[in-house]
Amino acid sequence: MQKAAKDYELDESLIYAVIRTESGFNADAQSDAGACGIMQVMPSSFEWLQQVRDCEGKYTEDDLFNPEICIDYGSYLLKYFLDFYGTETSAIAAYNAGFVVSDWLDNSDYSTDGVTLTDIPYPETKEYVERVTDAKAKYIELYYS
């Protein structure tokens, strides 16, 4: 996690919080939706990220169960969303729900400025953002303060 945090200029506590929320640190986790590994990366996202990173076909879906690979790609995806959306809340929401976050930001019911989410219409994603945010705060309190 330290390597990924350094490589992608991410707060370690954010990576820990996503892992805690996604898999409870279970490298063999697989969701009913098909997300794999310690950071629960979707195989379709993994394929897309390999294309984005110019390493298409380097890894297979099974490689998502390798914690080092999954943390690298999951962290890269988090950084991608942070850069794309500009706020941690939107990035965390996108990690869970994908690019639909763009629609929410364009809707005045969910964002007053097109940048900051004031509400999240998917209950699962809303709870997910709260859980990750709470876990991050706890990690900061326990290990970084």
Language model features with spans:
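Catalytic glycan-binding domains that act on GlcNAc-containing polysaccharides
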Residues: M1-S145
